[in-house]
């Protein structure tokens, strides 16, 4: 069963909002033969321009489902989040079930979800089955700090850059966020 931890930033989470989130995101349970014991972390944030940002993260045993959406209408944003999460589950379900079938194991996910859902998303599933790596690249990581890595990323015109952090000697990644700012991912051992 999926439990919910719902937090609001600049917004009070009313029973109506809580119920709507639990009802919509809770529908993901239908994709599992054995519903995992999971916690859905939901953060709802409102901004001064009345835009709402909804983030949902559901860590499972082998995968973390995560979706984020900004919308003027909170409820429409929740619907869009649910659609994104369903696409992620279907994509993952297809891969996992294929792998387990090849090994002769029982499917982890429900083989068929309502026929209407399957028909509506047949194109999505077909394109998700064909993962094709079209280019492979090898390079050595240079030691630098995160500011230097951002400069290198911008010089190359990329959206991310992998480097060896000079201070920690670990592999790190800087990336450009949707809001134009930068993020840093640091690896741990």
Curated annotation (Swiss-Prot):
Q: Where in the cell is it found?
A: Cytoplasm
The superkingdom of the source organism is: Bacteria
Which keywords label this protein?
A: Cytoplasm, Translation regulation
- Bilayer-spanning residue ranges: none
Cite a GO CC annotation.
Answer: cytosolic small ribosomal subunit
GO biological process entries: negative regulation of translational elongation
Primary localization class, coarse:
cytoplasm
- Tell me, what is one Gene Ontology molecular-function annotation carried by this entry? ribosomal small subunit binding
Q: Name one Pfam family in it.
A: Ribosomal_S30AE
Record note on quaternary structure: Interacts with 100S ribosomes.
The record's comment on protein family reads:
Belongs to the HPF/YfiA ribosome-associated protein family. Long HPF subfamily.
Q: What does this protein do?
A: Required for dimerization of active 70S ribosomes into 100S ribosomes in stationary phase; 100S ribosomes are translationally inactive and sometimes present during exponential growth.
Q: What is this protein called?
A: Ribosome hibernation promotion factor
Q: Which organism is it from?
A: Staphylococcus epidermidis (strain ATCC 35984 / DSM 28319 / BCRC 17069 / CCUG 31568 / BM 3577 / RP62A)
């Amino acid at each position: 069963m999926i439990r919910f931890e719902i937090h609001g930033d600049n917004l009070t989470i009313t029973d109506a909002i809580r119920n709507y989130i639990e009802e919509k995101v809770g529908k993901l349970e239908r994709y599992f033969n054995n519903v995992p014991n999971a916690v859905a972390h939901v953060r709802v944030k409102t901004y001064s321009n009345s835009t709402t940002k909804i983030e949902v993260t559901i860590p499972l045993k082998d995968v973390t489902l995560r979706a984020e959406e900004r919308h003027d209408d909170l409820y429409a944003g929740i619907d869009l989040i649910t659609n994104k999460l369903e696409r992620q589950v279907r994509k993952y379900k297809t891969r996992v079930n294929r792998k387990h079938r090849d090994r002769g194991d029982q499917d982890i996910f429900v083989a068929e979800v309502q026929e209407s859902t399957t028909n509506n998303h047949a194109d999505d599933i077909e394109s998700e089955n064909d993962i094709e790596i079209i280019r492979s690249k090898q390079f050595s990581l240079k030691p630098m700090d995160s500011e230097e890595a951002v400069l290198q990323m911008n010089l190359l015109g990329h959206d991310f850059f992998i480097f060896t952090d000079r201070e920690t000697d670990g592999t790190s990644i800087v990336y450009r966020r949707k809001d134009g700012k930068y993020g840093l991912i640091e690896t741990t051992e």
